[in-house]
């Protein structure tokens, strides 16, 4: 391809609305253009990157026995009502009505549709296991679309669904996909880490892993152990509690005045105690239940753990100041567990019962209790892991200090079990004619998100640094002066030779200054750049520059194409 023929409108200025590097560079490099908030058009070079990622995904899915299908984007509401997710999914579900006023949604995910297909087609255990996948546009009505392709309202995903006879079969399918994902992201040239994760709105109780591309700009925090294989999203990470030492004899708890102290920090400062000596008490409302959640004062409540632990209360929300005043008679900053009403369920984090004594709110303005002993001076109805984990805490598997990193989620694998097959009656008959629900797994990759994550991990001040396997083209040939016959003709000859060897090459045939060509090449991120100039040609050589390392080599013209072919084949792991 010739640069003069490519629709590649590069920009020198950073777009005002682009907050993260990937969004900035996708727009500046002429790979995407915004059509509406969270909705983008892929321009030719951007689409080439996307298709390369898709091809890697297809090859690895096919290698594991996956069969590609194409499911509808528009899904009938009755299927979502059958699964119970029509109301559960909330405002992020894009809903619409046809001319007959029938309700539909634009699919953010396809569990209902695929399960409906299977219940109509699968009859016998002989038809299992089955792995079906698609690469499809998805839709989510984000309240605030941001970060370009990282959080859009329209995005491209690969989702594969596995159907097995039993849990053992599901475990085998899960391992296949886990291994396939490891190969996919390795082939894409990305640094990543699989971590334990929360199942979110898709649900299921069998476990799940996220695949995180490591990048400082990542919106998710992960913790990992350098001494064993433990790694988890902070939303899921297990906490290993440790008892606190007692520094003085404990008497009966007593009330003290704490005027104007509404935060943990203010109370600790006023009483001259550590934040870890306090109990943080937060009131939640869920359906018709009131729940008081307790954690140590120096910890943060993990609301995902709270919601998962108290699963039946799907509408669990933090109570506002008016609700706290009505139920407990005080402002939120003075809430505490002592004397909690009987209709209040008190749920404590694992560390709270290990506190020898504690400071807690007295459910009265400007009052706190000191020297309160958990489970002696106030009741605890349930003890659960409810807090966020922090770097430096002991690993729950081996006890070594955990480390923290930032990551971008690009894939997730779920063990769904029978959540959807039972709800939608997707069953099969075993050898004895007995009926069983299919045991399901779900495995998603954010294809468009992977493209953005690759840029977040591979960029510098000059632009994108594409890994060779997913670069729009592998090499750009740049004749520095198109008016010089020798320079122009040598550039053309090298370009044609590279094409004959199967190298994906572009020729910058524009009548532009060398600096403009070099800036565009670096901005777009071609892995290799061949510079053809009269000075080096005088010695029968051209420059070969590696975009990632910046290394420049002088290579004989007659050796160049073979050298580049070898480099590309090595990067693509072609023997």
From Swiss-Prot:
A molecular function GO annotation: ATP binding
Any Pfam family hit: tRNA-synt_2b
Enzyme nomenclature, EC number: 6.1.1.15
Keyword annotations of the record: Aminoacyl-tRNA synthetase, ATP-binding, Cytoplasm, Ligase, Nucleotide-binding, Protein biosynthesis
Chemical reaction(s) catalysed: tRNA(Pro) + L-proline + ATP = L-prolyl-tRNA(Pro) + AMP + diphosphate
GO biological process: prolyl-tRNA aminoacylation
Gene3D superfamilies for the chain: Anticodon-binding domain, Bira Bifunctional Protein, Domain 2, YbaK/aminoacyl-tRNA synthetase-associated domain
Superkingdom as given in the UniProt entry: Bacteria
Gene Ontology annotations for the cellular component aspect, listed alphabetically: cytosol
Subcellular location: Cytoplasm
InterPro entries: aa-tRNA-synt_IIb, aa-tRNA-synth_II, aa-tRNA-synth_II/BPL/LPL, Anticodon-bd, Anticodon-bd_dom_sf, Pro-tRNA-ligase_IIa, Pro-tRNA-synth_IIa_bac-type, Pro-tRNA-Synthase_IIa_type1
HAMAP family noted in UniProt: Pro_tRNA_synth_type1
Assembly and interaction partners: Homodimer.
Notes on the domains: Consists of three domains: the N-terminal catalytic domain, the editing domain and the C-terminal anticodon-binding domain.
Record function comment: Catalyzes the attachment of proline to tRNA(Pro) in a two-step reaction: proline is first activated by ATP to form Pro-AMP and then transferred to the acceptor end of tRNA(Pro). As ProRS can inadvertently accommodate and process non-cognate amino acids such as alanine and cysteine, to avoid such errors it has two additional distinct editing activities against alanine. One activity is designated as 'pretransfer' editing and involves the tRNA(Pro)-independent hydrolysis of activated Ala-AMP.
Family, as annotated: Belongs to the class-II aminoacyl-tRNA synthetase family. ProS type 1 subfamily.
NCBIfam families found in the cross-reference section: PRK09194.1 (NF006625), proS_fam_II (TIGR00409)
PANTHER family with a match to the protein in the record: MITOCHONDRIAL RIBOSOME PROTEIN L39/PROLYL-TRNA LIGASE FAMILY MEMBER, PROLINE--TRNA LIGASE
Protein name (record): Proline--tRNA ligase
Encoding gene (name): proS
